[in-house]
């Protein structure tokens, strides 16, 4: 026989009016906040990733791929100078 922990059952929670009043506001708000975070470009600034139009510049059209096994630091320096 299982004991009672005093917690409400999941079915009781999701059928309550209070749950839906709270979540009908918070879930769309989180979605809108995430959409604004990405669409305004703030996500690019916060995480430091390049914007889609900044991957390839006029000077650098190739992929920055390290091909040398024994001189990777030289290639990294060369790539960083092109930024």
Curated annotation (Swiss-Prot):
Q: Provide the species name.
A: Panax ginseng (Korean ginseng)
Q: Name one GO biological process term.
A: photosynthetic electron transport chain
Subcellular localization, as worded in the UniProt entry: Plastid, Chloroplast thylakoid membrane
Please give the SUPFAM superfamilies that the UniProt record associates with this protein: Cytochrome b559 subunits
UniProt cofactor note:
With its partner (PsbF) binds heme. PSII binds additional chlorophylls, carotenoids and specific lipids.
Q: Which UniProt keywords apply?
A: Chloroplast, Electron transport, Heme, Iron, Membrane, Metal-binding, Photosynthesis, Photosystem II, Plastid, Thylakoid, Transmembrane, Transmembrane helix, Transport
Q: Which gene encodes it?
A: psbE
Record-level Gene Ontology MF annotations: electron transfer activity; heme binding; iron ion binding
Residues annotated as binding heme: 23
Tell me its family: Belongs to the PsbE/PsbF family.
Annotated Gene Ontology cellular components are: chloroplast thylakoid membrane; photosystem II reaction center
The protein depicted here goes by the name: Cytochrome b559 subunit alpha
Essential cofactor(s): heme b
């Amino acid at each position: 026989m299982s004991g009672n922990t005093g917690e409400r059952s999941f079915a009781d929670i999701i059928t309550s009016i209070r749950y839906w009043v709270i979540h009908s506001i918070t879930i769309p708000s989180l979605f809108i906040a995430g959409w604004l975070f990405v669409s305004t470009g703030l996500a690019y600034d916060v995480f430091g990733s390049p914007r889609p139009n900044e991957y390839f510049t006029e000077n650098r059209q190739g992929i920055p791929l390290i091909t040398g096994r024994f001189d990777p630091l030289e290639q990294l320096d060369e790539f960083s100078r092109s930024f």
